[in-house]
Amino acid sequence: MEGPRSDVGRWGRSPWQPPTTPSPEPEPEPEPDRRSRSRRGGGRSFWARCCGCCSCGNRGDDDWGPEPSGSRSRGTSSRGRDSRGGRRPESRGSGVNAAGDGTIREGMLVVTGVDLLCSRSDQNRREHHTDEFEYDELIVRRGQPFHMILFLNREYESSDRIALELLIGSNPEVGKGTHVIIPVGKGGSGGWKAQVTKNNGHNLNLRVHTSPNAIIGKFQFTVRTRSEAGEFQLPFDPRNEIYILFNPWCPEDIVYVDHEDWRQEYVLNESGRIYYGTEAQIGERTWNYGQFDHGVLDACLYILDRRGMPYGGRGDPVSVSRVVSAMVNSLDDNGVLIGNWTGDYSRGTNPSAWVGSVEILLSYLRTGYSVPYGQCWVFAGVTTTVLRCLGFATRTVTNFNSAHDTDTSLTMDIYFDENMKPLEHLNHDSVWNFHVWNDCWMKRPDLPSGFDGWQVVDATPQETSSGIFCCGPCSVESVKNGLVYMKYDTPFIFAEVNSDKVYWQRQDDGSFKIVYVEEKAIGTLIVTKAIHSNNREDITHIYKHPEGSEAERRAVEKAAAHGSKPNVYATRDSAEDVAMQVEAQDAVMGQDLAVSVVLTNRGSSRRTVKLHLYLCVTYYTGVSGPTFKEAKKEVTLAPGASDSVTMPVAYKEYKPHLVDQGAMLLNVSGHVKESGQVLAKQHTFRLRTPDLSLTLLGAAVVGQECGVQIVFKNPLPVTLTNVVFRLEGSGLQRPKVLNVGDIGGNETVTLRQTFVPVRPGPRQLIASLDSPQLSQVHGVIQVDVAPASGGSGFSDAGGDSRSGENIPMAYRGGA
């Protein structure tokens, strides 16, 4: 088991406060000038490394024939034209470049250009499932071949030698996989090879195979040739850079997924649902992952750079996912998002106001500063974007009644005084109403067999792991079976989903005694978006055995035996005959409500129960405020009878105390006079917020302006001030912020906006509203975008990205 985690992070009792001004790290060192790099590895040493079996240099230069005297030369050629002067479509390359005196000798094999077939409609992008990326460069997935065309100054001959080069990082080395040499027509090392598929005189069609273990990232690309007349090297051209990603379609890749519908959902879907609230009152919001938006891929790679992750480790999905979990939060390393659970978001954006990841990631890429602010669903949404973009099958997961174990006991310990009133100064463990993290799919070669598949990655900074704020990847299978000694961070994740809630009461002598153990209170429902639908999928069964089953109890006790309180189960008391259930009325914010406690006597004797009810507001992280209403009542139950106690709560009573998410916590404790049985229950519930209503105004066509109408009714009798709308949708609208001023109490407003779709197909346009008085207001509409006239699938026009406009309302009305 790993060492204990630190007591700093994402709950209210922490002394940590978000920094007023995030401080960026120094930017990464600039890479050496491309021209100096183009000379690296030239001449005899380069060709010696073109061994057909490996890069060991066992083949000497003589294998390529004697080097002609004075053969190293430099020359030029018109970009985009073949040797006959005709226009060469889609050609890339800006001339020629060879070491030496700059002379192009007669008979030298000169590469005048390269076509990487990298447009979105070309074969490479379609076959590699990268055609949705809003990039002009070639983007391929490792372990899968791609095609290119070399344009030559003369016909290719059997005696000619051609080698492709891929380089990444500031100091590329063959032994570290950062300098890849691929001899054309010969087998390379580690699965790299290039074959001629068609020789059309001056054009050479190649099929290039990449290694399924290749480093991911953006590679520089060049071509070298050697002939009897001399050597030549194509100069580096930024337009010829190649992105290589993980490949869930490749059986040899560690991230391989053997279900096409999973790949479509968990790799290619650009939007999804994130669930929040409480188990009894589940809320859902649509999130724009936007992994294919222009700039997002560069932002994802920048994250690895900012962490200083060695390039040699970027081919390992376990290492990459762990770095991502550390870098999506800002603690330790000035990562992407600043966490804030204080309720004061005046120096940034309320976490509830975000509608997607694109604005966050592009801001981080553009400025290098951590973005304020995030909470668990924002960290998870951004993590899904980053991992899907890099090629992981990833989903966003919500765990309701998620425990936060601060002392590695693997139990949730709650302390009460003699009258069963919570002792908040002792209650360091907390139960979050919900917590959102990620599952990503991969093999685990670093673990024994049986732990492949879904792995938990959690970027929310709760506790440290190996000294940094990260969590995972952790095998879900190890969590299910209580194998808390498996890396990474299994004890913490196990406690989140399957620990027991232990109630301790202070005795007359000051000691504490266990008076109640609630075995079914933690991890009560674990959900994610279903494949190919907006329905909710219950995945609790993959995290834990059926609640109360022998296998589930074994897993809990096995895990607890490795915790800091291994003997907690030895002190448990006898069975009970009075059952208690808590219910809360489903209410919208601004309305009155009621909470009820139902008692049932399951025994054969009369029972008298003395109840205490304490009501307070609570953050979704389990941090509660002071009690603002309480009630006491004695209930007498005949054998087999039930009775209820109801406590009404008026809007004016809870309004002054409301915090984020509109959640409340009811602490109920009771004592059965006849048997001494102790009753205890904590019940959270939330006030619902309204939705935004979105209506499309006309048909959506690529490259043509389209309108949308947004309608909102203020449910509160008070004015909403400084109201901000956000609008975003991949392929439709770049992130847009709209300042609309104030909205009166119970007022209905209508807002109209336009956007220009840039990609066809079904899309999601997502909006949110935020103000100091009301947040967590969202809306979404599906937009089916038709291709532009003429069949063009994509538009070069970008969505309107103006930000911070003051927008007049199209219509204002009363209640």
UniProtKB/Swiss-Prot annotation:
Interacts with PLAAT4. Residues 1-48, 62-101, 791-815 are annotated as: Disordered. Belongs to the transglutaminase superfamily. Transglutaminase family. One of its GO terms (molecular function) is protein-glutamine gamma-glutamyltransferase activity. This is Protein-glutamine gamma-glutamyltransferase K. The modification Phosphoserine is found at residues 23, 71, 83, 91, 94, 803. Tyrosine-phosphorylated. Palmitoylated. It comes from Mus musculus. Binds 1 Ca(2+) ion per subunit. The modification Phosphothreonine is found at residue 21. Keywords: Acyltransferase, Calcium, Keratinization, Lipoprotein, Membrane, Metal-binding, Palmitate, Phosphoprotein, Transferase. It is a lipid-anchor.
